[in-house]
Amino acid sequence: MKRFLSLILVLSLALSLIALPAMAEGEAFTITVNLHGLDKSGGTANKIGPKHAEETTGIKINYYELDSASAGEKINIMLASGDLPDAFLSIINETQVVSNLPLFVPLNEYLNEENAPNLMKMFEKYPELVDMITQVDGNIYTLPIGDFSNPDNQGEGIQFINKAWLDKLGLEMPTTTEEFYEVCKAIKEGDPNGNGEADEIPVTFTQNNWAAHFINLLGPYGICEWEGGGDGYLKVEDGKAIFTATLPEFRAGLEYWHRMAAEGLLDVEGFTQTNEQFYARLKSYSVASYRGWTPASNFAAEQAAEFTALPALQASDYPEIQSVTPGEINRFCGNCYGFAITRACKDPAALVRWFDAQNADAATKMLWKYGEEGKLWKQDENGKIWALWPEQTEDFTRENMKYTYGAMNHIPCLILPEELEENGDDAPVEATVRLGFVNAVKDHFPAERIPIRNVPAEKIQERNMLYTDLKAYLDSFVADCVVNGLDDAKWEKHLKDVEGYRASEWVQWYQDYIDKKF
């Protein structure tokens, strides 16, 4: 690590003799950023973090906002056309960067004590970061953002259930898929929301919210997503990559959810509904169970308190299979592809300095994450950060506050473990409820996961080429089976069809990745 940092320093000193392209006075950089669905600020530029950054650095930024639902497609068009912003912040992914490295600026020469003292200090304290952001050609094209680690982030989407409705109907908390079926039937017929209408939706989901994908409803059958790819169609056991979509338990899971759908217990519109429609369903107070970050994201305090984590259900027809839910203990929670400067930028050194300045201290980072001090956070005389919990309403929840005042993990800084905010003794119950939900299911996180490391661009392209059509087919097959059912003939045809989509080659790619063959 020290030798690597020394190399960066030597290279930067040598290149400092070369004149950098200069920007005209008063010219602004353009950064493409993520626009979160819970943000009610009216625009990134209205927030204290960006304002403070401009005041302290003198560097003006124009923020070009994309909503997460359409960002991927729009960024692909930008990359293909060459019509690029100066940088991307928290909105570009590994594939988009690695497959287009010539469009991005190698940052090595700008990472030195003079230009980026805060980043250099961070790399010295956490040398593993350098390995994580260094591509196979030896260059650093992206800088890490978000929370380095966070106990709340060990879990991903959690399955929630309205415990108050169970109590009202005299129902026990289900522990198996068959018990869950019976509970959902009772909810469908029992009018637990008390409006006199049969409008209850026992289970909903959406494919347009990272926390609420259908595939994770197959958790009782040992199948769930994992960060880094696969969408639940791949898992790892004893170091071996396994294709899940041809397993007998995969079929059993689809048959179970078709039964639920056929009886009106599963909201099949989840396969097509938007994130906004999903949130509207939740706010209608008709949903009994769904996947999400925390009920406080979707409800005012009184209704949010009715929900609790649904225990990881055991498949009644596969009792030997360990139920799983997405998550990983002590994982790195940051985004290694968080900040990427493009070749369109006339002065990369200035943008690196701007980014570095946002990593100066915990308070500066909190301005970006949570907004101005005194609303969602405060700093004591010892420099420690404490979370604040202002009163929320149904229309402006704490989650709205987070994305309206700040931007959470979509920020130009990496919050280190020692900088994370803590809750005081006077914090409300909801302050620790997310961690409680994670703790309730953490024993069911997959035992093995795909390791995260950088690979050559051509291997990323190979993986994507193999997976694009396969994923489209599998997503369609899953939706069709849940909505219309699955018989032996359909399953046998599926087993043949997946080979036509080169499923075995896709799985072998991951096996070679695990075995470090490239």
Task: Label the model's feature ranges.
Residues F4, L9, L13, L17, ...:
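Extracytoplasmic/secretory soluble proteins
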